[in-house]
């Protein structure tokens, strides 16, 4: 799970820096830094001990939950009950995908 969180922070953080530069008129240096961080996002999931499809499917759930949290903590947009419920549902899906017993 640590690698999923790290990948999520790279993807969301890098994307956010690009967003700030292109949508909010901040320095283009932020976009450049964001692109580098997005490149790290592409590498981090390779550290997962499972195959590509499972790793990215599970990561998608972590991304959703982290995005809600990022919006709350960074953008100061308080999630409503449906945002929170959806975040918990996708995290439950992550646990099923990654840790369900397989034979």
Swiss-Prot record:
Look up the domain of life of the source: Bacteria
Keyword Hydrolase set for record: no
| An example Gene Ontology CC term for this record | plasma membrane
Pfam family example for this protein? UPF0060
Q: How does it sit in the membrane?
A: Multi-pass membrane protein
Q: Which InterPro entries match?
A: UPF0060
Q: Does the keyword Transmembrane apply?
A: yes
**Localization annotation:** Cell inner membrane
The regions listed as transmembrane in this protein's record are: 2-22, 27-47, 55-75, 81-101
* Keyword annotations from UniProtKB, A to Z: Cell inner membrane, Cell membrane, Membrane, Transmembrane, Transmembrane helix
Q: Report the main location listed first in the record.
A: membrane
Q: Which family does it belong to?
A: Belongs to the UPF0060 family.
Give the protein name, as stated in the record. Answer: UPF0060 membrane protein Ava_2216
Species per Swiss-Prot/TrEMBL record: Trichormus variabilis (strain ATCC 29413 / PCC 7937) (Anabaena variabilis)
